[in-house]
UniProtKB/Swiss-Prot annotation:
It holds the Pfam family PetL. The keyword Thylakoid applies. It is a single-pass membrane protein. Component of the cytochrome b6-f complex, which mediates electron transfer between photosystem II (PSII) and photosystem I (PSI), cyclic electron flow around PSI, and state transitions. PetL is important for photoautotrophic growth as well as for electron transfer efficiency and stability of the cytochrome b6-f complex. This is Cytochrome b6-f complex subunit 6. Coiled coil: none annotated.
């Protein structure tokens, strides 16, 4: 059970990191 929770947190962290990086690059291109 804890392994599934850790996996879910890892996927959520990766998704947040990639989305933040994408938005950051997008904002840099807009400037």
């Amino acid at each position: 059970m804890t392994i599934a929770i850790d996996y879910f947190l890892l996927v959520g962290f990766c998704f947040a990191f990639t989305s933040g990086l994408y938005l950051g690059l997008k904002s840099i291109k807009l400037i």
